[in-house]
């Protein structure tokens, strides 16, 4: 009798061990499944176009995103803010980048677009280093771009004719510069180039040349960024509103962002990217700004 009882107890113990093992295997399988789900990578194709001022930022972020998500393909094209707004409105691209609010562009149905402000960019008047000028007043800047001051010697610089280098009317960089540097005054005729990289090269290669560039293009000594009324074109001065020439970097979608577009925009606005790529590329995180602006240019 005792022998039978012992056998029964051993069988029960064995059964309990098997049941426990099965339970652990089930939990392990579930855990592995949840882990795989959490590590799911983004995939698909995304086309972005627009602002050349934003291009260095978006390119750098897209490259890192694709490194982390090998099945995602992101194409970043420039063309200017007007192009970005038009193409996203037409559905030709999923994201349209712009230095200006959609409300500021004629022919754009701003109500159909959703604004994702991913950064702030400062812009500066940039001159050929041989001009001999590093700081001018805002009034002098307006006189240069409206053709009233024609030689750098009038400002204490070298005896060199001033050559203006402008962006086309579709450019958000031009719109921002005209609005906040020139107080709405239209620039005089000069060289007009669509690409910020080309503008920088012309300024660097042409004695007496002056144009305007986003801070993201002012990363070396090939051109000189001018201070305005003693205020240097630096991120900290943009953040406080002391330096006036800046713009939000808008990434617009037609309706709410979905799929890969949403994943990339969330990535671009994440704290990790804002504190690394955004600042490394010469932009300012929106969260660092002590002032705000609306579509009418009102600062508060």
From Swiss-Prot:
Protein name per the record: Phosphate-binding protein PstS
Superkingdom of the source? Bacteria
Q: Which Pfam families has this protein been placed in?
A: PBP_like_2
Keywords (alphabetical) are: Cell membrane, Lipoprotein, Membrane, Palmitate, Phosphate transport, Signal, Transport
Subunit-level organization: The complex is composed of two ATP-binding proteins (PstB), two transmembrane proteins (PstC and PstA) and a solute-binding protein (PstS).
Please explain the role this protein plays, according to its UniProt record: Part of the ABC transporter complex PstSACB involved in phosphate import.
Q: What is the lineage of its organism?
A: Bacteria, Bacillati, Bacillota, Bacilli, Bacillales
State the encoding gene: pstS
A Gene Ontology annotation in the biological process aspect, one of them, is:
phosphate ion transport
Compartment annotation: Cell membrane
Q: Tell me how this protein sits in the membrane.
A: Lipid-anchor
Q: Which NCBIfam families match?
A: ptsS_2
Q: Where is this region: Disordered?
A: 27-47
Q: Does the keyword S-adenosyl-L-methionine apply?
A: no
């Amino acid at each position: 009798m005792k022998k039978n009882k012992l056998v029964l107890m051993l069988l029960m113990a064995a059964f309990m061990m098997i049941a426990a093992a099965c339970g652990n295997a089930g939990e392990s399988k579930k855990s592995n499944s949840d882990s795989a789900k959490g590590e799911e990578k983004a995939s698909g194709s995304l086309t972005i176009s627009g602002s050349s001022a934003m291009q260095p930022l978006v390119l750098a972020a897209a490259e890192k995103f694709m490194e982390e998500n090998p099945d995602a393909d992101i194409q970043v094209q420039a063309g200017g803010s007007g192009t970005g707004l038009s193409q996203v409105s037409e559905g030709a691209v999923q994201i349209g980048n712009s230095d200006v609010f959609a409300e500021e562009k004629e022919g754009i149905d701003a109500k159909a677009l959703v604004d994702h402000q991913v950064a702030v960019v400062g812009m500066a008047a940039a001159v050929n280093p041989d001009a001999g000028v590093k700081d001018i007043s805002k009034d002098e800047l307006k006189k240069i771009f409206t053709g009233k001051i024609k030689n750098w010697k009038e400002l204490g610089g070298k005896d060199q004719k001033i050559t203006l280098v402008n962006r086309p009317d579709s450019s958000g960089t031009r719109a921002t510069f005209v609005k906040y540097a020139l107080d709405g005054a239209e620039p005089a005729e000069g060289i007009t180039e669509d690409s910020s990289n080309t503008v920088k090269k012309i300024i660097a290669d042409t004695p007496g040349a002056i144009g305007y560039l986003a801070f993201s293009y002012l990363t070396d000594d090939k051109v000189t960024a001018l201070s305005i009324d003693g205020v240097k074109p630096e991120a900290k001065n943009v953040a406080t509103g002391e330096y006036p020439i800046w713009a939000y970097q808008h990434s617009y979608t037609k309706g709410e962002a979905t799929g890969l577009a949403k994943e990339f925009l969330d990535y671009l606005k994440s704290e990790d990217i804002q504190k690394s790529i955004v600042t490394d590329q010469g932009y300012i995180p929106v969260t660092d700004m002590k002032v705000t602006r609306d579509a009418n240019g009102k600062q508060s």
